[in-house]
From Swiss-Prot:
Enzyme Commission code: 7.3.2.1
Protein localization: Cell membrane
Keywords for the protein's UniProt record, in alphabetical order: ATP-binding, Cell membrane, Membrane, Nucleotide-binding, Phosphate transport, Translocase, Transport
UniProt keyword Nucleotide-binding, yes or no: yes
SUPFAM superfamilies, per the entry: P-loop containing nucleoside triphosphate hydrolases
Protein name listed in UniProt: Phosphate import ATP-binding protein PstB
Record-listed ATP binding positions: G18, P19, S20, G21, C22, G23, K24, T25
Family label: Belongs to the ABC transporter superfamily. Phosphate importer (TC 3.A.1.7) family.
Length: 232
């Protein structure tokens, strides 16, 4: 990837758009260094989160990934109970106090707009939930770690329109507390929920601006071609 230079505003929603293979997800996973897990990946440049370069030698990777949560394209609840899914990360950090776990579990499910639907079945298997519920559970699991940033890689691509709407409404609500960066192939979704949009093509950030400006007055011809359906 190249020509990547942007400032993501705190407590905003930023979407990355562009054709498949243009580098959207690669960049997204760079923000919490998930790309480190891929053999042969090389990185040059700087990514700063709150004025700290995440590639500095003294960076605590575990802490970084706690502060920068990730929600993947396909809902991926663990094959355990709903409750255990939400508190899984907390337990891995050594938190064992049941009152604390119960409180954070409820808070996270409330924020994920799922509490009312599952509060009476917390011990039930998470895999028994619908696809939309599973994705909101995964968001609750990420929220439970109290991140500052939420990364979302096409979080509604595997969901039906009704479930998609619920997740979009949730994301808009979460913006009050979190900075959200999302990859989407849906231009309509980008216009509905994002404050800022970056258009990527062949590994290059072609244009980055407020979403309204990207879709109504793009500066680059390549951006205009893509959003008008003339991309080849």
């Amino acid at each position: 990837m190249f020509n990547i230079n942007m400032e993501i505003k705190e407590k905003s929603i930023t979407t990355f758009i562009g054709p498949s293979g243009c580098g959207k997800t690669t960049l997204l996973k760079s923000i919490n260094r998930l790309n480190d897990l891929i053999d042969g990946v090389k990185m040059s440049g700087v990514i700063k989160i709150f004025d700290k370069d995440i590639f500095d030698k003294d960076i605590d990777i575990t802490k970084l990934r706690t502060e920068v949560g990730m929600v993947f394209q396909k809902p991926n609840p663990f094959p355990i109970s709903i409750y255990d899914n939400v508190v899984y990360g907390l337990r891995s950090l050594g938190i064992k106090d049941k009152k604390i776990l119960d409180q954070i579990c409820e808070e996270s499910l409330v924020k994920a707009a799922l509490w009312d639907e599952v509060k009476d079945i917390l011990i039930s298997p998470a895999l028994g939930l619908s696809g939309g519920q599973q994705q909101r559970l995964c968001i609750a699991r990420a929220i439970a770690m109290k991140p500052k940033i939420l990364l979302m890689d096409e979080p509604t691509s595997a969901l039906d329109p009704i479930a998609t709407l619920k997740v979009e409404e949730l994301v808009l609500d979460l913006k009050k507390d979190y900075t959200i960066v999302m990859v989407t192939h849906s231009l309509q979704q980008a216009t509905r929920i994002s404050d800022y949009t970056g258009y990527f093509l062949k590994g290059e950030l072609v244009e980055f601006n407020k979403t309204k400006k990207i879709f109504t007055n793009p500066k680059d011809r390549r951006t205009e071609n893509y959003i008008s359906g003339r991309y080849e």
